[in-house]
Each structure stands twice: as C-alpha cells, then as structure tokens.
C-alpha cells in the first residue's frame, strides 16, 4: 500500500457513483452487478470487527443528455441497454421539460435516465473500509510500500492496481491518467 492514509488516493475523492448507462454490454452488466453487490454489502462484507458494514448508498438515477452530434451513438447504446434489461428510459429532447421542467432543453436531441433505484452513489471511503476489513479477515495482508520496478512477469492475466500511476511502473501499458471534473448542481425536486 503506497499510502495507508489514502490522502492522495483517487477513490476518496470520487463520488462513488454506480450506473448502468454505458455503451458496451460488458459495462452495463458490470453496472448491474455493482448495484446488486452494493445492496448486499451488509451481509457480504460483515466481519467480526465490522459487524454492520455500509457504503451509505443513495439510490438515485442519472440523467444523461446528448446533443445532435452524439444522439445516434446513444440510440445504439439504448439497444444494448434494452438487451441487458438495464431499465434505461429515453426522452426526446423536445419532451425533456415534461419530465424535468427546470432544464433548458435547447440543443438536447435525446436524454436517458433511470428511475428504478438501479443507479446512484455510495460513500467510497466507507465502501473501501468495508472491503479492506473483509479482505484482512480472510487473510489479506496490507504492506506499506511502493513498487519501483519489475524484472519479469509471466502470467496469463495481470491486474495492475496502480491506477493513474500505472505508466510509471509499466511503461508499455497504455494507461494514461485523466482528470475528471464534477459539478454539483442543485435542482428543484420534481
């Protein structure tokens, strides 16, 4: 573990969102699995030291809006959503104000959302704490340190948990850190 305080880790800074509105089938199915796992945290991650684990889940849908330049791609994504039973609803941009009267629909070709508690967010630090506690109970050992180099790796599958620092360790792996920006907007309840 590079930093056991997690001061510079990405996860405590994230919003802990889980959703299923993706383009690829695999991501949609991962989103569905995540939701089911999150609902089962109290049972799955219970430990002797943490008998009541939680991630403070807030089930709330995501509204994704698309202009004309991205509408066709989203219509194709909706076919995957339907095939995966993702529960995604589509709204024509011209009808957006019927569902969300406080949103300016100008320039919006289509929008998608869920209202079946299949998406939302969690407290990522609580979730991490519950996962770590369960891992320790099952024998995992967390060691403070930092991998500086690797001599040779012979494996069918390799999982790098270095996140945005992967490139520093594995130069041939095409992972580039990206900065994400989140805006919080307070809207009236509908």
Q: Can you name each region flagged by the protein language model?
A:
Residues 1-11:
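Glycine-rich FAD pyrophosphate-binding loop
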Residues 7, 155-190:
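Central helical "cap/lid" subdomain
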Residues 9-15, 102-106:
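Short, flexible, mixed-charge acidic loops at enzyme active sites
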Residues 11, 54-58, 174-176:
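Short beta-strand
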Residues 12, 77-78, 170-172:
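Short amphipathic alpha-helical segments
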Residues 15-99:
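Dinucleotide-binding Rossmann-like beta1-alpha1 core, especially the glycine-rich loop
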Residues 60-62, 109, 178-182:
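Short hydrophobic/aromatic beta-strand or adjacent loop that forms the aromatic wall/cage
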Residues 113-157, 161-162, 167:
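Helical element adjacent to the flavin cofactor pocket in flavoenzyme catalytic cores
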């Amino acid at each position: 573990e590079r930093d056991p305080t997690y001061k510079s880790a990405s996860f405590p800074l994230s919003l802990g969102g889980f959703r299923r509105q993706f383009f690829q089938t695999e991501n949609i199915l991962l989103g569905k699995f995540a939701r089911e796992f999150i609902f089962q945290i109290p049972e799955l991650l219970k430990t002797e030291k943490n008998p009541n684990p939680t991630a403070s889940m807030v089930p709330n849908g995501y509204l994704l809006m698309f202009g004309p330049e991205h509408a066709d791609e989203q219509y194709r994504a909706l076919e995957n959503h339907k095939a995966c039973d993702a529960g995604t609803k589509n709204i024509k941009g011209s009808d957006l104000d019927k569902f969300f009267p406080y949103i300016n629909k100008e320039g919006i070709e289509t929008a998608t959302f869920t209202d079946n508690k299949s998406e939302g967010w969690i407290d990522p630090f609580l979730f991490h704490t519950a996962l770590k506690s369960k891992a320790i109970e099952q024998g995992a050992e967390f060691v403070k340190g930092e991998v500086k180099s690797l001599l040779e790796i012979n494996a069918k599958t390799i999982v790098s948990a270095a996140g945005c620092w992967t490139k520093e360790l594995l130069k041939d792996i095409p992972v580039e850190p990206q900065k994400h920006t989140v805006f919080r907007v307070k809207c009236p309840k509908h």
